[in-house]
């Protein structure tokens, strides 16, 4: 090869070399540029790949953690599955037991349906009985209203009769007191007349004393006292009888009666019997032998028959008999007591009938008046019928009155004891005993 400094041909060779060199340079530059650009791209891709590797590493760590967690979850799920299987076994056994119970319940349901049909029939029967009982209850209410009306009517009737009895007793007492006053005045007048006659007869007997026969039987003073003492003995007894019979259970009237009896004249309370005993004894000793002395005759009446018959007809044989409560006066209180007793017996019979219709129903079984239900028997037997104690006593008293074997006296004593009460209280007590 020739160096650069040698001589060459001018115009061809250098330009070709330069062109080739330029082409090579261009190619190399292009290659460099392409390689450098590719290198940059590759670097970028490497960086991206490194980032992806990092991300994948992070994701791998996460996945590993998640895998471990999932493994734990799998273990727990396995345990839960095992537990669920055990629960399933238990539930299957329970289900079988429930199925058995369901079968038994179905059997019981069938039985209950059969029982329901019977119970519906019983309910229908009980409804019919309830309707009958309601009708019976309404009938009992109607009877109760009727009994209450009868009760009020009987109470009013009893009060009215007791009031009438009280008025009649007051009228009879007033009449009796007027009769006593009239008899007292008559007795005083007759006593004055007898004193005058006895004084005149005493003078005539004093003249004829020596001419009287001596064979007259001596009458002792006790006989004279017996003839004269009944006035003093029977007068208080008459007061007591008037007080016992006349009041008829009126306390206020009884006090008035005692006050009026105390206001009687002194001649009625203390008759002059003791003062005339000596004179009567003298007149009796001078009686003739042929004329006996009557027990009810006054001492001066026999002399009046011998000497003055006209005066003996005007004057009674014994003036004290008008005051002494004799058989006539005793008969009047007896009539009053008999009428009162008869009225009380009639009331007792009415109350007894009311009682029987009140406490017994149509089947002759006792009924409670407050609740309207039948009372139970004593021993639970159908043959035994319960009775009230008041019914027994009323029936015994009624039987004793019908038999007449002494029970009437007890009933009369009870009635007299009840008549001494207030009429209103008597009526209430009698009616409460009946109810």
Curated annotation (Swiss-Prot):
Could you tell me which InterPro entries the record lists for this protein?
GOLM1/CASC4
GO CC term (a single one) = membrane
Phosphoserine is found on: 232, 365
What segment(s) does the record annotate as region Disordered? 191-239, 271-435
| Post-translational modification N-acetylmethionine, affected residues | 1
Keyword set for this entry?
A: Acetylation, Coiled coil, Membrane, Phosphoprotein, Signal-anchor, Transmembrane, Transmembrane helix
| Composition bias type Basic and acidic residues, residue spans | 191-212, 223-239, 343-361, 425-435
Q: What is its main location?
A: membrane
Q: How does it sit in the membrane?
A: Single-pass type II membrane protein
Q: Topology: which residues are Lumenal?
A: 36-435
Q: Where is the composition biased (Polar residues)?
A: 282-294, 302-320
Where in the cell is the protein located?
A: Membrane
Acidic residues compositional bias, start-end: 398-417
Family indicated by similarity? Belongs to the GOLM family.
Q: What is this protein called?
A: Protein GOLM2
- Which organism is this entry from? Mus musculus
User: What gene does this protein come from?
Assistant: Golm2
């Amino acid at each position: 090869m020739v160096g650069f400094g040698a001589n060459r041909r001018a115009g061809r060779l250098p330009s070709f070399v330069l062109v080739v060199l330029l082409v090579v340079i261009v190619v190399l530059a292009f290659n460099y540029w392409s390689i450098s650009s590719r290198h940059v791209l590759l670097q970028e891709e490497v960086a991206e790949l490194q980032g992806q590797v990092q991300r994948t590493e992070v994701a791998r760590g996460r996945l590993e953690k998640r895998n471990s967690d999932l493994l734990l979850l799998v273990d727990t799920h396995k345990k839960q599955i095992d537990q669920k299987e055990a629960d399933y076994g238990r539930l299957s056994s329970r289900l079988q037991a429930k199925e058995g119970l369901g079968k038994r319940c179905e059997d019981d349901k069938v039985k209950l349906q059969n029982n329901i049909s019977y119970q519906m029939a019983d309910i229908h029967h009980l409804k019919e009985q309830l309707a009958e009982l309601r009708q019976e209850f309404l009938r009992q209410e109607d009877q109760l209203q009727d009994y209450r009306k009868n009760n009020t009517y009987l109470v009013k009737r009893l009060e009215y009769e007791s009031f009438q009895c009280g008025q009649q007793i007051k009228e009879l007492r007033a009449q009796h007191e007027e009769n006593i006053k009239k008899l007292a005045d008559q007795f005083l007048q007759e006593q004055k007349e007898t004193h005058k006659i006895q004084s005149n007869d005493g003078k005539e007997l004093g003249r004829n004393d020596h001419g009287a026969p001596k064979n007259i039987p001596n009458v002792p003073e006790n006989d004279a006292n017996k003839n004269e003492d009944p006035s003093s003995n029977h007068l208080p007894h008459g007061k007591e009888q008037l007080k016992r019979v006349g009041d008829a259970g009126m306390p206020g009237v009884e006090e008035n009666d005692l006050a009026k009896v105390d206001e009687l004249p002194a001649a009625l309370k203390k008759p002059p019997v003791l003062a005339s005993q000596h004179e009567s004894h003298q007149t009796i000793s001078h009686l003739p032998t042929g004329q006996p002395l009557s027990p009810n005759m006054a001492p001066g009446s026999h002399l009046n028959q011998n000497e003055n018959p006209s005066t003996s007809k005007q004057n009674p044989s014994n003036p004290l008999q008008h005051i002494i409560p004799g058989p006539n006066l005793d008969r009047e209180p007896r009539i009053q007591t008999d009428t009162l007793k008869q009225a009380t017996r009639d009331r007792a019979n009415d109350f007894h009938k009311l009682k029987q219709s009140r406490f017994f129903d149509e089947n002759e079984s006792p009924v409670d008046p407050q609740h309207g239900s039948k009372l139970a028997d004593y021993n639970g037997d159908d043959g035994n019928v319960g009775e009230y104690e008041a019914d027994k006593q009323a029936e015994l008293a009624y039987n004793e009155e019908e038999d007449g074997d002494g029970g009437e006296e007890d009933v009369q004593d009870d009635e007299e004891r009840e008549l001494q009460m207030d009429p209103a209280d008597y009526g209430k007590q009698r009616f409460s005993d009946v109810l």
